[in-house]
Amino acid sequence: MEPKQKILIVDDSEINRAMLKEILGEGYEYLEAENGLRAIEILRRRTDIALVLLDLIMPEMDGFDVLRVMQCYAWQEEIPVIVISAAEDNRSVERAYDMGVADYIRRPFERVMVLRRVKNALMLYAKQKRLTRLVTDQVYEKEHNGVLMISILSHVVELSLIHISEPTRRT
């Protein structure tokens, strides 16, 4: 049985965290943070987080500060972030996307929208990781083939030089 993907839910409202877990169901393992500072602590310790659901408006450290730290460590290259926030202004949405979020869901939201967008983000990042692995494997294979070709060519040149430098025997 495959291990469940881990989702970090960052929201200062315990009710919101519980609601998101209930919407997403038992197919995931959940980590919870009540503020941005706690989220960063968890992200520093855990390398197996598949997705972050992030509220923007929180005490101590807001969602934008969390995104800034994630950018500094390039965590968003590996972990998609979906903002779920009651922030109404378009500037917040634009700023969140500029900071690298995979998606933005405004509250109030429909259950099916949250479920679908989480699945889509996880699927897209899994495909991206698989493509990155394939490209990396191809680069290593080409590099290995190039080294092998250089070795063969150097032996051919060496044999040619030996053949050229030998005195020709006349009969």
Regions found by a protein language model. Give the residues of each.
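Two-component/phosphorelay signaling modules centered on CheY-like receiver
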Residues: 2-5, 13-32, 44-45
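C-terminal output helix
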Residues: 91, 109-118
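Helix N-cap/capping motif at the beta->alpha junctions
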Residues: 32-41, 63
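Single conserved hydrophobic/aromatic residue that forms the stacking wall/gate
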Residues: 163-171
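Receiver (REC) domain active-site loop signature in two-component systems and cognate sites
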Residues: 58
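Short amphipathic alpha-helix used as the core "switch/output" element in two-component signaling
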Residues: 41-42, 64-77
